[in-house]
Regions:
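Hydrophobic alpha-helical transmembrane segments
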Residues: 4, 18-22, 322-323, 351-359
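Hydrophobic alpha-helical transmembrane segments of multi-pass inner-membrane transport and secretion
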Residues: 15-42, 251-287, 310-319, 364-367
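Hydrophobic, regular-secondary-structure patches
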Residues: 26, 30-117, 136-138, 143, ...
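Mechanotransmission and gating elements of multispan inner-membrane complexes involved in transport
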Residues: 85-88, 105-113, 139, 153-155, ...
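Short beta-strand boundary microenvironments
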Residues: 112-156
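Transmembrane alpha-helical interface segments in multi-pass membrane proteins
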Residues: 278, 283-332, 356, 360-364, ...
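Short juxtamembrane loops and helix-capping segments at transmembrane helix boundaries
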Residues: 328-355
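Short cytosolic juxtamembrane segments of multi-pass membrane proteins
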Residues: 374-386
Length: 386
């Protein structure tokens, strides 16, 4: 085999063309990782939203909370179910919830309006969802027009500070606290008391009922029991699975766009690698002739130049990873197509995506270097030495 040092020396001797080719590959890799990090972050935000200990109950046939409706009688039936866990005070850990969209102007441009989820909860919701933590202020008091704002909203919408007033549904609502939810979609919601939300939004109807399972392993049994109850027509979902499913449509679209955009850009990067390698082979034809003369097989020449092209691509891949790393943790937002509400989430650049970016770079390098390397391997010794 031809020593790899030969290819490394060749790359170093052509700094400008090597740098331009590597930069082209790096930009493609950065876009590839960035788009996948966007899809990854969106999926992770919704996946964190649910707990495998909880069950969310919707009207039968409803595929989202927005299209569901459940009466007070259903809430009472579920609260009495033996599969429901109880709190330290002996009360069932059940939260009948109102789920509506409210239009709010954005902080950076008040002419832009976004739909934000307003969730009316019971007092038990804070125990049902163990990932919720109040970071500032006090929980809304029962019987008052008070709300708690998710951490992701406080920097994106005005009037969300403690003591400030939000206006929606024809009423003023005082912000009494901020909360986090382990980076989940709940952080993009406004929470208030369900009994305060019901009269101004949808009357005597809840959109969903969430409860904590007494035994998380007994979900199937609880699901069968609830769905077989003739007094109500409901579907029961494990909360974690329900919210993960909500991310599938947009997640797939973002992943598809990532692949399409990077494939288009990759074509340009591959042609750049082809031009670079053809130029390298043309200038080193005598060297190739010498290699063939001293006994190196044509296939070793092919492998050598493929390795050289891949090496340049790896440099580009590393650059692309470095370009993409600062994206990690940057907060952005999009519309959740399942609920038509705005959801804020962070770009999520993982080690897996970085490795995937490097592999993609190597693939581009090998494709771009194959035909020039094949030409080098097929050179006739006499022709090469001229």
């Amino acid at each position: 085999m031809i020593p790899i040092a030969y290819n490394v020396r060749s790359v170093v001797q052509r700094p400008l063309s090597t740098a331009l080719t590597a930069l082209g590959v790096g930009l493609v890799v950065a876009v590839f990782i960035g788009m996948l990090a966007l899809a990854n972050g969106f999926g992770a935000a919704l996946a964190k939203t649910g707990s495998r200990q909880n069950v969310i109950v919707l009207r039968k046939g409803a595929d989202s909370e927005l299209s569901s409706g459940l009466g007070r009688d259903v809430a009472s039936i579920i609260a009495a179910d033996p599969h429901v866990a109880t709190g330290a005070d002996g009360r069932p850990l059940v939260s009948p919830e109102v789920y509506v969209l409210v239009p709010l102007a954005k902080a950076f441009d008040t002419t832009q309006i976004a739909n934000v989820v307003a969730r009316g909860i019971s007092d038990q919701a804070w125990q049902v969802r163990s990932n919720i933590a109040i970071t500032e202020g006090q929980k809304p008091a029962s019987g008052r027009a008070e709300v708690c704002v998710g951490a992701r909203l406080t920097t994106r919408f005005p009037h969300t500070g403690i003591g400030q007033t939000l206006h929606f549904a024809g009423r003023d609502w005082t912000v009494t606290c901020h909360f986090t939810a382990a980076g989940s979609a709940f952080e993009s919601e406004i929470w208030g008391e369900n009994e305060q939300f019901m009269p101004v939004f949808r009357g005597e109807v809840f959109q969903s009922i969430t409860f904590r399972l007494k035994d998380p392993a007994a979900f199937d049994e609880a699901q069968r029991s609830l769905q077989a109850d003739k007094r109500m027509t409901v579907d029961a979902h494990r909360e974690a699975d329900f919210y993960a499913q909500q991310s599938q449509l947009l997640g797939r679209i973002l992943s598809f766009l990532a692949i399409m955009i990077t494939v288009i850009m990759a074509v340009g990067a591959v042609f750049g690698a082809i031009n670079t390698m053809y130029a390298a082979i043309a200038s080193r034809a005598p060297e190739i002739g010498v290699l063939l003369t001293v006994g190196f097989k044509p296939w070793t020449v092919l492998v050598s130049f493929l390795a050289e092209s891949a090496f340049i691509a790896v440099i580009g891949g590393v650059l692309g990873c470095l370009f993409a790393l600062p994206l990690n943790g940057i907060v952005t937002s999009t519309t959740n197509w399942s609920s038509f509400s705005e959801i804020a989430f962070s770009f999520r650049v993982t080690p897996f995506l970085l490795v995937l970016g490097l592999v993609f770079a190597v693939v581009m390098g090998v494709i771009g270097g194959f035909f020039p390397a094949l030409r080098a391997a097929r050179l006739q010794v006499v022709q090469a030495l001229r």
